[in-house]
């Protein structure tokens, strides 16, 4: 299994390649040859009364290609600016994020890559 970090991702694929892959996956889904599960978030109170922990996952795959699950780990809090309230998130400290994608072959179940997403 390959371990691919953020620097590797930006070096290995272009935005155009990502867009083409997404278009292909959506076409597979439209044709009934792909599956997906919407993102599911699980929230747990933290010891701080003004923030909570959120774990989120989403997954999908295409026939004859790949299956992927994306996982993320966030601390959530609300910030008021004027009359607006926004939901902010971070992992470990503000400005940092933590997510990863596990990629598998749907032909033999082989784990192919662990991709940093954060």
What are these language model-derived features?
Residues 1-118:
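N-terminal ligand-binding/catalytic initiation module
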């Amino acid at each position: 299994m390959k371990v691919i970090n953020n620097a590797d991702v930006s070096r290995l694929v272009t935005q155009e390649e990502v867009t083409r892959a997404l278009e292909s996956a959506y076409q597979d889904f439209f044709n009934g040859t792909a599956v997906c599960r919407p993102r599911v978030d699980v929230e747990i109170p933290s010891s701080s009364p003004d923030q909570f922990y959120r774990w989120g996952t989403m997954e999908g795959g295409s026939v004859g290609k790949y299956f992927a699950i994306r996982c993320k780990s966030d601390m959530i809090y609300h910030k008021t600016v004027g009359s607006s309230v926004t939901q902010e998130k971070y992992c470990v400290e503000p400005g940092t994020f933590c997510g990863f994608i596990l990629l598998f072959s749907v032909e033999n179940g082989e784990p192919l890559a662990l991709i940093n997403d954060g």
